[in-house]
Amino acid sequence: MARIALTRDKIVQATIELAGKIGLSNVSFPRLAEYFGIKAPSLYNHFKNMEEVRVATAVHLQKELNYELTHAMVGLTPLAALRAYAESYKRFAEKYEAVYELINVIHQTNNGELEYLAKENIRLVRRSLENFHLSEEENFHISRMFRSTLHGFITLTQLGYFRQSGSISKEESFTYMVDHLLSRLDNPENI
């Protein structure tokens, strides 16, 4: 049998794939070793433990999320950029549903790179909000509200809420929610 050229990135990619099949909480060194057809101790050449794998996966996901958000927002008006952020964030969360929780482990790790990437994500929203001539405090609050609302909707969806209820789909509710949040920016008196 040929020796596999194992890398940290391959382990991260396998973690994402396995999480989609067996659930993130079931991904372990033995499961990863089985995936690669190797013995589990070989993984210790790349990571000390599963917590390091989870953090590396979180960094990978946050980088990809920031890339997708930035490219979705570039060249748009501030309002359109925020809408693109919301839609791109939701698509990302749906694509990576099995590992979505990892982009929210920033304060549980002590990882400077992950913290920096999370702040970059926040800056994308705050920079767009600067165009609405808000006070620093309003920018801060609206940024938190916007990101919290998106995360809440995604989390509740992943928990099984928002299933088809009559003739209203979760996509319609998401669009309504984003429209309502952004409409307040169009009329500063509502803020």
Each predicted region: which residue ranges?
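Hydrophobic alpha-helical connector segments
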Residues: 70-98, 110, 134-136, 142-146
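The alpha-helix within a helix-turn-helix
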Residues: 33
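N-terminal intrinsically disordered/low-complexity leader segments
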Residues: 1-6, 189-191
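Hydrophobic/aromatic residues within well-ordered alpha-helical segments
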Residues: 57, 61, 65, 85, ...
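Amphipathic alpha-helical packing segments from all-alpha helical-bundle domains
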Residues: 70, 108-136, 140-145, 156, ...
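An amphipathic alpha-helix adjacent to DNA-recognition modules
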Residues: 5-16, 20, 25-26, 37, ...
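Residues within helix-turn-helix
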Residues: 30, 41
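Amphipathic C-terminal alpha-helical segment
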Residues: 95, 102, 148-167, 180-191
